[in-house]
């Protein structure tokens, strides 16, 4: 359900583009992102840093698109977000010696130490490549193709990447000790 909620601005952007064009779609995406963050704040009294970052980027690139009446800015938005993700994943290991993928996933997955480094690198490279691919589509195809790629192509590639990664990780997963598995479920309401 969270995945669909996170896609809310993208889906509305796509629908608005099909009905009214890129500038209305950009406005809709900006408003939808603000509403999404307001809802999260209202419900949880906390908003993730990534959601704030997304709001900042849609504000800057969406705003530039509307002010300068130039769709190139909104086409750069996914690339900037992807590249930021990739750089943060790589930079966190180098600068603060923290593997962010491990920090996010180690409660669900037990892997050998070397695999965590590889997983972080693979995710970083995936995001860097996705940013390049977005620019390739944005500059070599018309806006209609880019909008379709933004929703269907990007999501499709993400799903394929996650499935391939799952198969790859399954070969390297370690069994957790019985007491560690029970400790992980303490307080679980299932």
UniProtKB/Swiss-Prot annotation:
Keyword tags: Cell inner membrane, Cell membrane, Membrane, Transmembrane, Transmembrane helix
Pfam families per record: IspA (PF04279)
InterPro entries reported for this sequence: YciB
Subcellular location: Cell inner membrane
Transmembrane segments: 3-23, 24-44, 49-69, 76-96, 121-141, 149-169
Membrane protein topology class: Multi-pass membrane protein
GO cellular component: a single term: plasma membrane
Claim: Cell inner membrane is one of the keywords in the record: yes
HAMAP family xref list: YciB
PANTHER family cross-referenced by the UniProt entry: INNER MEMBRANE-SPANNING PROTEIN YCIB, INTRACELLULAR SEPTATION PROTEIN A-RELATED
Function statement: Plays a role in cell envelope biogenesis, maintenance of cell envelope integrity and membrane homeostasis.
Protein name: Inner membrane-spanning protein YciB
Organism listed in the record: Ralstonia pickettii (strain 12J)
Gene, per the UniProt record: yciB
């Amino acid at each position: 359900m969270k995945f669909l909620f996170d896609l809310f601005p993208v889906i509305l952007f796509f629908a608005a583009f099909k009905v009214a064009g890129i500038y209305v779609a950009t406005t809709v995406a900006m408003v939808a992102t603000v509403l999404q963050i307001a809802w999260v704040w209202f419900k949880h009294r906390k908003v993730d840093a990534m959601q704030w970052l997304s709001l900042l980027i849609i504000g800057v690139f969406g705003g530039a698109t509307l002010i300068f009446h130039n769709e190139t800015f909104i086409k750069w938005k996914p690339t900037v977000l992807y590249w930021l993700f990739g750089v943060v994943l790589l930079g966190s290991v180098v600068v603060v010696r923290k593997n962010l993928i491990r920090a996010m996933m180690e409660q669900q997955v037990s892997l050998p130490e070397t695999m965590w480094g590889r997983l972080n690198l693979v995710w970083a490279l995936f995001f860097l490549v996705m940013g390049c691919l977005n620019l390739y589509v944005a500059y070599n195809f018309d806006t209609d193709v880019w909008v379709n790629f933004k929703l269907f192509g990007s999501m499709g590639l993400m799903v394929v990447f996650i499935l391939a990664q799952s198969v790859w990780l399954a070969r390297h997963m370690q069994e957790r000790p019985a007491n560690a598995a029970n400790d992980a479920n303490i307080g679980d309401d299932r």
